[in-house]
Amino acid sequence: MKLILTADVDHLGAVGDTVEVKDGYGRNFLLPRGLAIVASRGAQKQADDIRRARETKAVRDLDHANELKTAIEALGPVTLPVKTAGDSGKLFGSVTAGDVVAAIKKAGGPNLDKRIVRLPKAHIKALGTHPVAVHLHPEVDVEVALEVVPQS
């Protein structure tokens, strides 16, 4: 089944891309969720317009992503105080991407979307310094040193 994506889909493509998928995936997942439309001549012209606009926007986004990268790198290590379970150094919960975004903002950094934060594992569950990747743009990634410390 040939479809045109109306939203970014992980491991498949970006908005405006024409993709070939299995019928069941297209009919049961992509189309009902509004992530794609069936490819036709009119839809293809619309996809070309979307792609041109996306390429223009990508240049502006790349400049903005580089500015954000500079601002985040200027912060240095970001500290996140959390509740711990005794002296063992384990946490009562876990540190999520939302917690990382809040810590970056509190440290004076830009407001980010939690979906662009890539934790080293699913969640951070111990004290210490952990590298956290922030995916700002397909060409721009920045690594933040997150210091998880016990709350006083």
From Swiss-Prot:
GO terms for cellular component: ribonucleoprotein complex; ribosome. The keyword rRNA-binding applies. PROSITE patterns: RIBOSOMAL_L9. Binds to the 23S rRNA. HAMAP family: Ribosomal_bL9. NCBIfam families: L9. This is Large ribosomal subunit protein bL9. It comes from Mycobacterium avium (strain 104). The gene is rplI.
